[in-house]
Amino acid sequence: MAKTDLARRVYNHTWKLDPIIRSLLDTDFYKLLMLQMIWGLYPRVDATFSLINRTSSVRLADEIDEGELRAQLDHARTLRFSKKEMIWLAGNTFYGRKQIFQPEFLAWLHDFQLPEYELRRKDGQYELHFHGPWTHTTMWEIPALAIINELRSRAAMKNLGPFSLDVLYARAKAKMWSKVERLRQLPDLKISDFGTRRRHSFLWQRWCVEALKEGIGSAFTGTSNVLLAMDTDLEALGTNAHELPMVLAALAKTDDELRSAPYRVLQDWNRYYGGNLLIVLPDAFGTAAFLRNAPDWVADWTGFRPDSAPPIEGGERIIEWWKSKGKDPREKLLIFSDALDVDTIEETYRHFEGRVRMGFGWGTNLTNDFAGCAPQSIDGLKAISLVCKVTDANGHPAVKLSDNPQKATGDPKEVARYLRFFGNEERVEQLVRV
């Protein structure tokens, strides 16, 4: 693939010819996996997704021009899946399985369009909501976040000249490559790109993916970005997300339905997928509550993705649970993905080496680490913690508790109710940077 002169591309400001979202495949693979299940099992559920800026000190509406934001959101709504993309989805092998997407689902997907959005400014922030059928609003999460993060990067670099931009990208590349050299020292490492939603830009994410592909070879197992997977002949990777148990819990009519919501999600998932896609995401309402109430069959799944507890602490908790169920952790898989960088990856890898199979999903600190790279300090180049979460389902508020109270989302009264119901044990307060 031809190399792009990133500094020159930024300096030319040719944004009308260079939209942020180029394709509906410019999303995380698990959104398509989840979408097929939602389409098949929950086609009549409405769900609202909302932008949440957890770095509240950053006033997004003061940094990003509203007209530019609307133009990019409007452009994303014009996109449709191309013939080439549909053929690739239908014919490619994912996780060792052919035709993972049903023909009826692909026929429906052919005419898919992102739904309308609701945008307004309030107190220096943007309120951005997506209302409508869950089958449609779920697909806004990744492009909305990518658009806002890239617009913020563009605004921060707007006044830099060509030499300053050259220096910026040269330093960022050197910084990234120094991480590659450290990762090479970890034998049998398995790591993938999870950095789409908070990336500096699409072109920078592509550079990082190509750098990892060359730099660490087979240790780089693929990318969550479907478009990049298709374009670079990499594996498209991803399992499932918190929105599934959040929606089912919001729809629960009884305490039993609320308690069983996380496990019903897994049963639904197992109807569609198997093997290495049988990865449990346990922390939507706290990992302690999940493990305490989990049916025995959950221990038969391939692995867990501890997403909000400190990685070593969270991994140890799951290993002990596997042992209590008579399972050998060496035959199981832990996928670490929360705010990872090289130090955390090295520490976690060495702690668990030989005790459990490991994979690492490297996100924001892969695709948006420009700290200290600009010739002068630019706050707008520092990554922020921005999420787009489901906030209601069929008019009922949706809640995420997380293992880190700083990551909890939802109406405060509902969060308090869920805490009373699921418990508050073993949740660890940590500063959320990304």
From Swiss-Prot:
GO cellular component, one term: cytosol
Pfam families: NAPRTase (PF04095), NAPRTase_N (PF17767)
Protein's UniProt keywords contain Signal: no
InterPro entries, A to Z: N/Namide_PRibTrfase, NAPRTase_N, Nic_PRibTrfase, Nic_PRibTrfase-Fam, Nicotinate_pribotase-like_C
Residue positions where Phosphohistidine is found in the record: 242
Catalytic activity: nicotinate + 5-phospho-alpha-D-ribose 1-diphosphate + ATP + H2O = nicotinate beta-D-ribonucleotide + ADP + phosphate + diphosphate
Enzyme class: ligase
Entry keyword annotation includes Ligase: yes
PTM per Swiss-Prot/TrEMBL: Transiently phosphorylated on a His residue during the reaction cycle. Phosphorylation strongly increases the affinity for substrates and increases the rate of nicotinate D-ribonucleotide production. Dephosphorylation regenerates the low-affinity form of the enzyme, leading to product release.
Keywords attached to this entry: Ligase, Phosphoprotein, Pyridine nucleotide biosynthesis
Pathway it works in: Cofactor biosynthesis; NAD(+) biosynthesis; nicotinate D-ribonucleotide from nicotinate: step 1/1
Biological role stated in the UniProt entry: Catalyzes the synthesis of beta-nicotinate D-ribonucleotide from nicotinate and 5-phospho-D-ribose 1-phosphate at the expense of ATP.
UniProt similarity note: Belongs to the NAPRTase family.
Protein name, per record: Nicotinate phosphoribosyltransferase
